[in-house]
């Protein structure tokens, strides 16, 4: 079974589950129904958590480091980026360097 990390704005903390029928959830559910193992990675919620309640440069830096460590632990086959503007290109290049066979979509 292929592992996919879905990086998107899931609004889990801020809106308290208000948008659980949004597009990120629909994309994840569609991938699960097609036989993939999907790990949802809420980038904006984690940035707020790492930035002490605000989306600031401290949260962004820690978020990018956390994504690299998260990929090292989970060893995904693909990363699906959905409106994740907080993830830097350098982070994606570093993940691609660590896992050359990884697909970034």
Regions found by a protein language model. Name each.
Residues 2-17:
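Nucleotide-activated donor-dependent transferases that construct or modify glycoconjugates
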